[in-house]
Amino acid sequence: MATTFSASVSMQATSLATTTRISFQKPVLVSNHGRTNLSFNLSRTRLSISCAAKQETVEKVSEIVKKQLSLKDDQQVVAETKFVDLGADSLDTVEIVMGLEEEFGIQMAEEKAQKIATVEQAAELIEELMQAKK
């Protein structure tokens, strides 16, 4: 966690070899809540921070996607992988969502499920729903 007031903050993830340096003009609180990836989108008037889903959730989702689409074991499926790039159509996506719901013990609202296009989006929604269950 980092707090800064009109200063710079430098963060380095232990698993990554990169360092991110950011300069802020207003008070900002940064916390990664146990996630390994933080990304910062800076514009002149605002800062938005998006966090990738936990790696273990992404890996589980990737395995389920590979299983549902009958992909080979050596087929690479990562967080940024789009279902359509794997050859999935709308019916395949419905089957993926059903598999995810069963595996994680959750129910996805249809309007949210229809917006899922990547492994990471699925993982983030799953984490959101699991957190809401607590």
Swiss-Prot record:
Coiled coil: none
Location of the Carrier domain: 55-130
Record's subcellular location: Plastid, Chloroplast
Molecular function (Gene Ontology), one example: acyl carrier activity
Alphabetical keyword list: Chloroplast, Fatty acid biosynthesis, Fatty acid metabolism, Lipid biosynthesis, Lipid metabolism, Phosphopantetheine, Phosphoprotein, Plastid, Transit peptide
PTM section of the record: 4'-phosphopantetheine is transferred from CoA to a specific serine of apo-ACP by acpS. This modification is essential for activity because fatty acids are bound in thioester linkage to the sulfhydryl of the prosthetic group.
Modified residues (O-(pantetheine 4'-phosphoryl)serine): 90
Coarse class of the protein's main subcellular location: plastid
Pathway: Lipid metabolism; fatty acid biosynthesis
GO cellular component, as recorded: chloroplast
Segments crossing the lipid bilayer: none
Xref: InterPro entries: ACP, ACP-like_sf, ACP_chloroplastic, PKS_PP-bd, PP-bd_ACP, Ppantetheine_attach_site
Transit peptide: 1-51
Tissues with expression: Seed.
Cited PANTHER family: ACYL CARRIER PROTEIN (PTHR46153), ACYL CARRIER PROTEIN 1, CHLOROPLASTIC (PTHR46153:SF9)
Further remark: In rape seeds ACP is coded by two multigene families. There are probably a total of 35 genes. The sequence shown is that of ACL1.C1.
Assigned protein family: Belongs to the acyl carrier protein (ACP) family.
Function: Carrier of the growing fatty acid chain in fatty acid biosynthesis.
Protein known as: Acyl carrier protein, chloroplastic
Organism: Brassica napus
Lineage summary: Eukaryota, Viridiplantae, Streptophyta, Embryophyta, Tracheophyta
